[in-house]
A protein has these predicted regions:
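N-terminal intrinsically disordered/low-complexity leader segments
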Residues: 1-30, 158, 211-215
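Alpha-helical structural segments
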Residues: 30-41, 45, 59, 76-96, ...
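Helix-turn-helix
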Residues: 42-76
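Short, hydrophobic secondary-structure boundary micro-motifs
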Residues: 52, 126-129, 192, 215
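Secondary-structure edge/capping motif, primarily at the C-terminal ends of alpha-helices
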Residues: 93-96, 100, 128-132, 183-187
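Amphipathic C-terminal alpha-helical segment
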Residues: 117, 173-190, 202-214
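Amphipathic alpha-helical segments used for helix-helix packing
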Residues: 118-137, 181
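Amphipathic alpha-helical packing segments from all-alpha helical-bundle domains
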Residues: 136-171, 178, 193-201
Length: 215
């Protein structure tokens, strides 16, 4: 996959003045998508705190009036951008977890999807795991909900339904996120896919210790 191709696909083509036969709701959706992509690009390059509405307008190719028709402020735009980043990452993870295969193979596929997507989409990765912490309470609450969903999916794949088992799933996902975040902050995106194998080895070892019969 081309580096950054999923984000580019979200941006779509540049809209021009006039109707051109495009339904109004499609124009609205396209404008919102372009501004969300513009925010992801700006926040990844400059850091959320330094981003201005003008930065988003320049990248999205829309007017200031259009921006405020969609978003009350910069934080609201970042929230939409974060949701787009979540969709890009979690869609591939969800597909892996939904596969018709044994639990550990699904977990392996989900980790591969997670790390490879972050490596291929560096701007998305920065917004998803780094700049989210600078964007205010509403975005942080959304981030917590996203991670809780990831924990639920992981626990469900392993059949971990008891409270103690969920805590273990939460610890595993916390470690995955921390490892990825450290590499992203360091700018070492190439190291991300290599995290999957040692994590899977550790997980398998833990499961074998819990179930010596390997059932």
């Amino acid at each position: 996959m081309e580096r950054g191709s999923l984000l580019k696909a979200k941006a779509g083509g540049k809209l021009h003045g006039g109707n051109h036969g495009i339904a109004p709701e499609e124009v609205v959706a396209a404008q919102r998508a372009r501004m969300s992509v513009g925010m992801i690009e700006a926040a990844a390059q400059k850091g959320y705190a330094a981003v201005t509405v003008a930065d988003v307008l320049e990248r999205a190719g829309v007017s200031r009036m259009t921006f405020y028709q969609h978003f009350a402020n910069k934080e609201a735009c970042f929230l939409a951008a974060y949701d787009m980043a979540v969709e890009i990452v979690m869609t591939r993870i969800g597909a892996a977890l939904a596969a018709e295969s044994p639990a550990l193979e699904r977990i392996d596929g989900a980790l591969d999807a997670y790390f490879s997507t972050l490596a291929q989409e560096p701007e998305v990765a920065k917004v998803f795991l780094v700049e989210v912490y600078a964007a205010g309470t509403a975005v942080l609450q959304r981030r917590l909900a996203t991670q809780a969903g990831f924990v639920d999916a992981f626990a469900g794949a392993l059949g971990a339904s008891l409270p103690d088992q969920r805590v273990v799933a939460e610890a595993v996902i916390g470690a995955v996120v921390a490892l990825a975040t450290n590499r992203i902050v360091a700018g070492d995106f190439g190291a991300l896919p290599g995290l999957r194998e040692p994590l899977m080895s550790a997980l398998i070892t833990k499961l074998v210790r819990q179930d010596p019969a390997g059932s």
